[in-house]
Amino acid sequence: MTTEDTLTIAGRSYQSRLLVGTGKYQDFAQTRAALDASGTQIVTVAIRRTNIGQNPDEPSLLDFVPPSQFTLLPNTAGCYSADDAVRTLRLARELLDGHDLVKLEVLGDPQNLFPNMPETLKATKTLVDEGFKVMVYCTDDPIQCRMLEDLGAVAVMPLASLIGSGMGILNPWNLRLIIDQSSVPVLVDAGVGTASDAAIAMELGCDGVLMNTAIAGARDPILMASAMRKAVEGGREAYLAGRVPRKLYSAAPSSPTEGLIAAAK
């Protein structure tokens, strides 16, 4: 990849298009090892579940993942209302000395973790009005994604399938519609299970992929993080290169048809 092909979010550019979560690892040391193997530059943190200073007597993620080396992306995992999400991100901004790039997710059901879009839209408006730069976990509905962009979201993050399901990309057509209409980055968020899922997302034209369970839940998280790094890079290169059209039959054989040696009679 060239240095010119960067992911730009809220005016800041990144070489890596892979965003990685920090939950579900054995400990903070394994978290850091996986992040290093992934090559990520943006690390998402569940404020309600991860200590970043709100519990001074416990180990802090920031001791292993310092803001000087990574862009931290506080998220609202576990929030089921706009009010809870807004309060959580206000706390994150206070703990991180005014940090304003955040990931909003407002869940609608504790079993499937599907986004509650009315509450998500409500929270997006409030956060944007308060000066946050909001990346939004959302459904793969193109209309809802357009509404989020109109409200001022700096990135839309449609799910590929349910959070933690590992089912991969179930609706590539909606993702294509969202990509084609959006003027902000589109990143797949949720559902990636293995490297090929990440590659497909990038081949579709997504600007990036965010994942946690696919790496942290793998038998070897460090090796999977490395695999995901290569998959995202390879998928992006394939998208830029441009795939050949799908055809039922080959209109032009790749083997030469001229200059063939005639069979002896």
UniProtKB/Swiss-Prot annotation:
Query: Which GO MF term does the entry hold, naming one?
Result: thiazole synthase activity
Query: What's in the keyword line of the UniProt record?
Result: Cytoplasm, Schiff base, Thiamine biosynthesis, Transferase
SUPFAM superfamilies to which the protein is assigned, alphabetical = ThiG-like
A single GO CC term for this protein reads: cytoplasm
Cellular localization per UniProt? Cytoplasm
Q: Name one GO biological process term.
A: thiamine diphosphate biosynthetic process
Task: State the top-level EC class.
Answer: transferase
**In which residues is 1-deoxy-D-xylulose 5-phosphate bound?**
164, 190-191, 212-213
Active-site residues from the entry = 103 (schiff-base intermediate with dxp)
UniProt-listed InterPro entries: Aldolase_TIM, Thiazole_synthase_ThiG, ThiG
Q: Which Pfam families match?
A: ThiG (PF05690)
The answer to whether the entry has keyword NADP is no
**Catalysed reaction equations from the record:** [ThiS sulfur-carrier protein]-C-terminal-Gly-aminoethanethioate + 2-iminoacetate + 1-deoxy-D-xylulose 5-phosphate = [ThiS sulfur-carrier protein]-C-terminal Gly-Gly + 2-[(2R,5Z)-2-carboxy-4-methylthiazol-5(2H)-ylidene]ethyl phosphate + 2 H2O + H(+)
Q: In which pathway does it act?
A: Cofactor biosynthesis; thiamine diphosphate biosynthesis
Tell me the superkingdom of the source: Bacteria
Catalytic activity, EC: 2.8.1.10
Gene3D superfamilies, sorted: Aldolase class I
UniProt keyword Cytoplasm present: yes
Q: Which HAMAP family match?
A: ThiG
- Reported function: Catalyzes the rearrangement of 1-deoxy-D-xylulose 5-phosphate (DXP) to produce the thiazole phosphate moiety of thiamine. Sulfur is provided by the thiocarboxylate moiety of the carrier protein ThiS. In vitro, sulfur can be provided by H(2)S.
Q: Which family does it belong to?
A: Belongs to the ThiG family.
How does this protein assemble?
Homotetramer. Forms heterodimers with either ThiH or ThiS.
Protein name per UniProt: Thiazole synthase
- Natural source organism: Bordetella pertussis (strain Tohama I / ATCC BAA-589 / NCTC 13251)
Q: Which gene encodes it?
A: thiG
